[in-house]
Swiss-Prot record:
Entry protein name: Stalk-specific protein A
Main location: secreted
Gene3D superfamilies: 2.60.40.290
BP GO terms, sorted: cell differentiation; extracellular matrix organization; sporulation resulting in formation of a cellular spore
Organism, scientific name: Dictyostelium discoideum
Length: 157
């Protein structure tokens, strides 16, 4: 009985650890400045500049001062993910940093994208893929006028 409990505990630990890393290559498999590229389940690390399969573009929608929030300046951005492949992108993970200073942590400050607790952005459940040669747009409102630093961390197709 004791060995069964130990085995169950071990299996639960493995399951939890596996679920903690949402991308197949793992969070630390590629070096800084590289993209984890997953093609038919095969993981490769390539330099960001060599990742032509997908691109991110940032557009300023508008900037304003909000008197109800202490006269702080806010900027709304649209981010477009473009699939340059002849095949669908199954999943994409986008890294952020301290520059992703959301107005607040509500659904009115970020939309059409999932923000994971570790700051990584992923496709929402209602957008399971990005079709070949198509694009998908998400947006957010940031405090200030500095755009967020966004980098493709992992792409699966």
């Amino acid at each position: 009985m004791r060995s069964i409990l130990i085995l169950l505990s071990l299996l639960l630990t493995i399951a939890f650890a596996s679920a903690s890393f949402p991308y197949q290559c793992g969070p630390y498999s590629c070096q800084f400045g590289q993209v984890c590229r997953i093609d038919n389940g095969v993981c490769n690390c390539i330099p960001i500049n060599d990742c032509h399969e997908v691109s991110l573009s940032t557009k300023v929608v508008g900037t304003w001062v909000d008197g109800s929030r202490g006269n702080k300046r806010f900027t709304q951005y649209d981010i477009t993910i473009t699939n340059n492949l002849n095949t669908n992108i199954k999943q994409i993970y986008i890294a952020t940093d301290y520059t992703l200073r959301l107005r607040d942590h509500s659904n009115t400050s970020i939309w059409n994208v999932n923000l994971l607790p570790n700051g990584i952005l992923t496709l929402p459940s209602y957008q399971p893929s990005i079709n070949a040669h198509a694009s998908f747009t998400f947006g957010f409102i940031l405090e200030g006028t500095q755009p967020a630093n966004l980098n493709v961390l992992s792409v699966s197709f």
